[in-house]
Amino acid sequence: MQSSLARPLRPPVLAGRGGRRGLVAVARCHAEAAPPVGTASRAPAGPYTGRDPEVKKPAWLRQRAAQGEKYARLRESIGELKLNTVCVEAQCPNIGECWNGGGGAGGEGDGIATATIMVLGDTCTRGCRFCAVKTSNKPPPPDPLEPLNTALAVASWGVDYVVLTSVDRDDLPDGGSSHFAQTVKALKELKPGILVECLTSDFRGDLEAISSLASSGLDVYAHNIETVRSLQRIVRDPRAGYDQSLAVLKHAKACREGMVTKSSIMLGLGETDEEVKQAMMDLRAIGVDILTLGQYLQPTERHLTVREYVTPEKFQFWKEYGESVGFRYVASGPLVRSSYRAGELFVQNLVRNNKTGSSSS
């Protein structure tokens, strides 16, 4: 039976704004009864953009506006120091929960606040069709003081775990790897006990750039495959690729004993269950430890149309499946993003145990 979403949409349009990691905006589905587990309305096949005016946001995707004391304090500090965060630039729906320490948009949580700092500026050289980060072929040069300023800011917040990410910088000889590495080293010098996760670009597959960053003192090397193999050219910038992303993660894992690696997959772009399972197996085959899965939400009508709204029950299925095939930690849910509660205690213990094991062997 044809879905009411399966009607002609506007022709494909390459997103005028794009990037790698942002995700969010208003996602909506029909106000009818919720579909069975693992099913949802689908748009036509193909790289369609635009929004269907007849669809409505499902209840499980509604999120209160971010508020709370920790959130307000962190937002003020980031603004004063002129730092970029993927939480803001990519319109992440979990900004309140992560910045408040796991307590939702405004409640009290476990106290583990996580902010993802975006280095190398706020302008990406690539134009992935899912992302809200702005793009340009010639972004401004990196701020040479950014590594130190970032380290000073993070050290002042008193956090034990920080995520550093970046836009793609194909305009730089090393893709920005050395700038990234300088930031990690500055953080470790100011606060040796802090755990640092780096969510990186693919550096155009440059293994030396990957090695440089992987050897900088970081604790978790993250790089996202974003979607299943068959949808790569539709979803990501042509300069990115499934096999190239796997090669990045494989090389990072080999750079240091005890290295924890991580990746993420968006659902709702038209992938099949078998394709998701294959992507998981491909990641496990190269030793990836941590996986996150979340719903793709369309940032603007110029970005890819949501083709499926995956139910919370199906996300729970994927969490259990991921654990069954060997991932050491799986975060799976409609609003989960790459850095979702990255620093929670289980992940911190996983990283520290890996360090202890590698140093004693």
UniProtKB/Swiss-Prot annotation:
Give its localization. Plastid, Chloroplast
Q: Give all residue intervals belonging to the Radical SAM core domain.
A: 107-328
Q: Which GO terms describe its biological process?
A: lipoate biosynthetic process
The record's catalysed reaction(s) read: [[Fe-S] cluster scaffold protein carrying a second [4Fe-4S](2+) cluster] + N(6)-octanoyl-L-lysyl-[protein] + 2 oxidized [2Fe-2S]-[ferredoxin] + 2 S-adenosyl-L-methionine + 4 H(+) = [[Fe-S] cluster scaffold protein] + N(6)-[(R)-dihydrolipoyl]-L-lysyl-[protein] + 4 Fe(3+) + 2 hydrogen sulfide + 2 5'-deoxyadenosine + 2 L-methionine + 2 reduced [2Fe-2S]-[ferredoxin]
Q: Keyword set for this entry?
A: 4Fe-4S, Chloroplast, Iron, Iron-sulfur, Metal-binding, Plastid, S-adenosyl-L-methionine, Transferase
Name the cofactor(s) required for activity, per the record. [4Fe-4S] cluster
Task: Give me the comment on cofactor binding.
Answer: Binds 2 [4Fe-4S] clusters per subunit. One cluster is coordinated with 3 cysteines and an exchangeable S-adenosyl-L-methionine.
GO CC annotations, alphabetized = chloroplast; mitochondrion
One Pfam entry for this protein is Radical_SAM
Catalytic EC class:
transferase
Keyword Transcription assigned = no
- What does the entry list as the binding residues for [4Fe-4S] cluster 2? 124, 128, 131
- The entry marks the following residues as binding [4Fe-4S] cluster 1, namely 87, 92, 98, 339
Major location, coarse class?
Answer: plastid
> What EC number(s) does its UniProt record assign?
2.8.1.8
Q: Name one GO molecular function term.
A: metal ion binding
Q: What InterPro entries does the record point to? A: Aldolase_TIM, Elp3/MiaA/NifB-like_rSAM, Lipoyl_synth, Lipoyl_synth_chlpt, rSAM
**Other remarks in the entry:** This protein may be expected to contain an N-terminal transit peptide but none has been predicted.
Q: What is this protein called?
A: Lipoyl synthase 1, chloroplastic
Give the source species: Zea mays
Taxonomic lineage of the native organism: Eukaryota, Viridiplantae, Streptophyta, Embryophyta, Tracheophyta
Quote the gene name from the UniProt entry.
LIP1P-1
